[in-house]
A protein has these predicted regions:
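Conserved N-terminal beta-strand of ABC nucleotide-binding domains
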Residues: 10-12, 23-25, 151
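Conserved ABC transporter NBD signature motif
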Residues: 60-68
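Helix-to-loop junction immediately C-terminal to a conserved catalytic motif
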Residues: 52
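ABC ATPase nucleotide-binding domains
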Residues: 76-80, 84-231
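The feature captures the beta-strand-to-loop junction immediately N-terminal to the Walker
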Residues: 37-39
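ABC ATPase nucleotide-binding domain helices that frame the ATP-binding cleft
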Residues: 45-48, 144
Length: 241
C-alpha cells in the first residue's frame, strides 16, 4: 500500500460569507492515522471533503505526497473515502460492491475478483462475497464500505464519521477493526469524528478543531494530559476541567 503525507498550507474555505475553514495549516504524516475532532460546524468534515476533492478550497494549497492537488478533480487524487452512510449499492452483491471501483478503471475480471476476495478476507468478511447488503448487519456493511475503499490501494484513506450509525458496542469493535486494518496496511488515514473517546482510542495524532480553526493538535496522551485551553479541556474530557 502506498503511503503519502498530506499537507494543508493556509487553507480557507468560505460558503458565501460563512467561513468553514479559516487559514488552516497542518500535516497528516505518511502511514499514520490522524483524527479531525470537534463539535458540529467546526470545519472538520469540510476539511476532509477538501482533501477528497469534493469541495474546492477558497484559498491555500493542499499537497499529497508533495504534489499540489488543490484544483485536481476527486477522480485524479488517488484518495478513497468511507462515508457515514456506507453508500453501498443495494442491488449489488458484496463482491460487486467491493470490485466496482476496480471495474471502473478497467482492471480485468480475474484480477478484480481475486483482489476483492483478498480484501474481504482482510476485513473479516471471507465467505460473504455473494450476500446482498440487506442481508448484512450495520457493522458488516461498514466493513464492505472499508473493503471497497482499500481495494483501490489509495495513497490516502478518508473516513467521515463512519461509526455514527452503529450502536455503542459495535462502534467499539468496528473502530478497533479500522485501526487494525490501517496499521496492517500502513496507509495514511484521516478520520473525522465528534466522539472524543473514539479519537483518543485509535489515533496517532488528533487535531482538535473549533470555529473553523485548529484549537490544538498532538498525540492523544498529550491532548488529554496537557490541554492548551479551556475548550480543549472541556471537549477532551471532564477529568481535565
Amino acid at each position: 500500500m502506498k503511503k503519502a503525507e498530506v499537507k494543508f498550507e493556509n487553507i480557507t474555505k468560505k460558503f458565501n460569507e460563512t467561513v468553514a475553514v479559516d487559514n488552516v495549516s497542518c500535516s497528516f504524516e505518511a502511514g499514520t492515522l490522524t483524527t479531525l475532532l470537534g463539535p458540529s460546524g467546526c470545519g472538520k468534515t469540510t476539511s476532509l471533503r477538501i482533501i477528497a476533492g469534493l469541495e474546492r478550497a477558497t484559498s491555500g494549497k493542499i499537497l499529497v505526497d508533495n504534489e499540489d492537488v488543490t484544483i485536481l478533480p476527486a477522480t485524479d487524487r488517488d484518495v478513497s473515502m468511507v462515508f457515514q452512510s456506507y453508500a453501498l449499492f443495494p442491488h449489488m452483491s458484496v463482491i460487486e460492491n467491493v470490485s466496482y471501483g476496480l471495474k471502473m478503471i478497467n482492471v480485468n475480471k480475474e484480477e478484480y475478483i481475486q483482489k476483492s476476495l483478498e480484501t474481504l478476507k482482510l476485513v473479516n468478511l471471507e465467505g460473504y462475497e455473494n450476500r446482498m447488503p440487506s442481508e448484512l448487519s450495520g457493522g458488516q456493511q461498514q466493513r464492505v464500505a472499508v473493503a471497497r475503499a482499500i481495494v483501490l490501494e489509495p495513497k490516502v484513506l478518508l473516513f467521515d464519521e463512519p461509526l455514527s450509525n452503529l450502536d455503542a458496542k459495535l462502534r467499539r469493535q468496528v473502530r478497533e477493526d479500522i485501526r487494525e486494518i490501517q496499521q496492517k496496511l500502513g496507509v495514511t488515514t484521516i478520520y473525522v469524528t465528534h466522539d472524543q473517546e473514539e479519537a483518543l482510542a485509535i489515533s496517532d495524532k488528533v487535531i482538535v478543531m473549533n470555529n473553523a480553526v485548529i484549537a490544538q493538535e498532538g498525540n492523544p496522551k498529550d491532548l488529554y494530559n496537557f490541554p492548551k485551553n479551556k475548550f480543549v479541556a472541556n471537549f477532551i474530557g471532564d477529568a481535565n476541567v
